[in-house]
Amino acid sequence: MSETKNVRTLQGKVVSDKMDKTVTVLVERKVKHSLYGKIIRLSTKIHAHDENNQYGIGDVVVISESRPLSKTKSWVVSELVEKARSI
């Protein structure tokens, strides 16, 4: 009865941290066009939960799927891959 569930994870770049305890992550993926065969880049913006407001714009993070936390938020930031370079 103790089955483990595979959790979906995605990697993306933080593009907004203006909301409290929430970051907007831009996830890019490459897809082959069905008719022409050209490789194109598609992107999706996902709202993710950031409990301690510790991630900033430009950080590369890994997000994992969770239960719905609000109307638009059902992902949680799980780890930091690369910190944004400060000028």
From Swiss-Prot:
Keywords: Ribonucleoprotein, Ribosomal protein, RNA-binding, rRNA-binding. InterPro entries: NA-bd_OB-fold, Ribosomal_uS17, Ribosomal_uS17_bact/chlr, Ribosomal_uS17_CS. GO terms for molecular function: rRNA binding; structural constituent of ribosome. Disulfide bonds: none annotated. The keyword RNA-binding applies. HAMAP family: Ribosomal_uS17_B. Part of the 30S ribosomal subunit. This is Small ribosomal subunit protein uS17.
